[in-house]
Every structure is written in C-alpha cells, then in structure tokens.
Amino acid sequence: MQSFPPEIWHHIFDHLISFDKFEAKNFGGLLRICRSSYVGGLHAIYYFPKLNPRNYHKFVDTISRKPTRKLVHHISLNNVSYASKASITSRLLRRCATNLETFSGPQSGLGFTALRAFSQCQKLKKIDLSILSEKIDLQYLFGGIQHLKHLEYIILPYLSIPAPMCTECWPSSLTFVGFSGGLTDDFLAESVFPPSLKSINITQCPLLTDAGIFSLLSKIGPNLSSVCVQYPMPELSRSGLDCIFQLCPNATTISIPANYITSTAFESIPESGHNVRSLEITYSGSLLTNISLIKADDLVGALVDGKLPNLHRLQWSIRLGWREESQDVQDLLELIDDQDGEVFITVK
C-alpha cells in the first residue's frame, strides 16, 4: 500500500487538532498506520496529551528526551487524580517549560517546587487550579507566576492562603481571574491589579464580606466586561451585591446569585442605563425560606425605565418561583422580546 509522505500526515493531524485546540487528544492509533504517519503525527500526540493515571508516569519518563518535550503545549492533570506527586509535577513542568501554554492542575501533588517551576514556563497563558484539594500558600504561587508576561488566565484553588507580600505580584497581562479560597477583605483591598483585567469569577470565598466585594469592584469594576459571582459566599449579606451595576458600569455579561441581591440592585441603576447584554440570576435555596427574593417585577421596572436598554439575554433560576403565567413574568417576557432578546429558565 502506498503511503502519504510525512508532510501530508502532518497536515492531517494539524486539521484534527484544529477542531478544539484546548481539548486533550489521543491519536495514538493513527501513529501505527505506517512510519510516515508516526513521523508526521508525533507533534499532534504531544501537543495536548490525553493523560490518565495509567499513562501519566510513562509520559513523564518519555518527555525526558529533549526532542519530545518541546512538542508539549497544553497539559491537563484533571484526570490524573491522586497519581501525581509534587516532585513529579515539578519535573513535568520543568521538562515541558519551553512551549507550555496552558496548565490544569491535579487534585493533589502541587507543592512548593511545582509552584516555583511555573517561573520557567515563560509562554504560559492559562493556569487552572480549580480542582486542587490541597492548601496552597499564594506566596509560593505568586513567586512562580508574577513575571510570566503572557499569563492571561488564572483560577486560584479553593484552599488558597493569601500572603500580604503578594498584593503587588499579580502578573501584568492578566485578563481573567477566578477568585476563590481564603482571600480576605484586606488582601483584595491592598492588591494592585493590572489594567488588562477584564473578567472575574468569584466563588467559594468564605472570608469575603460586603466590604471586600465593594473594595474589589470599586477598584477594578469600571474595566470589567464580565462578572460572575457564584454561591456559596457565606459572609455576604442579602444586599452584598446590590452595588454590582453601579460599580461595573461597562460589564456586558453579569451572573449573580439572588441570595445576595435585593430590588435595590435594579433601582440603583443610573437613569443613563447599564450596558449589560447578558444577565443570569441564579439561586441556591428553597422557596420555603423567609428571605424576600427579587421578583420579575423588579426587572420589569428597570426595563420600563430604560435602565437595561441593551439586555438581549436573560436567564433565571426556576427556583426563584417566578410563575410563567403570572402578569409580571408575562410583562418581562414581552419587554425582552421588544428588545429582540431571548429568555432562558434554568435549574441553577
């Protein structure tokens, strides 16, 4: 059987990668077709390897060879579970440092040496530590990332421990930060964020109070285009996020829990209106609670007053108890339709 030359196989694998560059791939079977497919497709196998507990240690051993390690651009250890140790993760990062662009951490095995190893990955654009179940001192994390000039995206671990000396160590090119863990009001108040920051997600921050949220949004809110706050935030009051429209006037995408907003959030929108285009209102709670939840009529009032002129996508939780046949919901649906918008009801 006549085989394609390696150059053709190279283009075939490039095409397969292009479907989703940020998804781990396993094209191992294609490498076995012939020698040309192996030579032409090796870069695709290592570009974003599909790692699991069975192949992880073999992969780390394989990339000890210099020609191979340069092929790795993306690493996800989400499926490695507890197979990774800090020393192995550190070795992995050092070996793949040349071209590594994204890194998703494991549930465990990200100690001091691994955090420091980030400093060698000068092309890193994204770090996701959202599933890490170990306590991480941000002093060591920031020590590894503060000089990464291309880092745009980072999600902090749920068990992060802030350090006062890190408040001025945020990388200069960040566009997205996922805040979580033991962040305090004082830490956020003293932090110096880069002007490039455009999108944030706040969740699982048990120490943050209304004052911390207000301080953070007062500082970075005008620059944000996307704001997402997720339940639980146990120290936030019922009105803890009422300031979000005022402090984030340019955010076009907003997702907030009804647990922390009241009708004041919409009443306080300036008469000049807000730029939000996509608004999601989630709710984690029971309808049997004594909490007075926002009503559809609160949004109706804001729309009638022209305060939400650009709202084209509205999504709310079915748990809010807004009955579709009620007059206020019907009015809300009609007003959104008049703006050529769409409405979604979710279970969140």
From Swiss-Prot:
GO terms for molecular function: ubiquitin-like ligase-substrate adaptor activity. One of its GO terms (cellular component) is ubiquitin ligase complex. InterPro entries: LRR_dom_sf. Its main location: mitochondrion. It comes from the Eukaryota. GO terms for biological process: proteasome-mediated ubiquitin-dependent protein catabolic process. Keywords: Mitochondrion. Disulfide bonds: none annotated. Signal peptide: none annotated. It is found in: Mitochondrion. To yeast YDR306C. Interacts with skp1. This is Protein pof5.
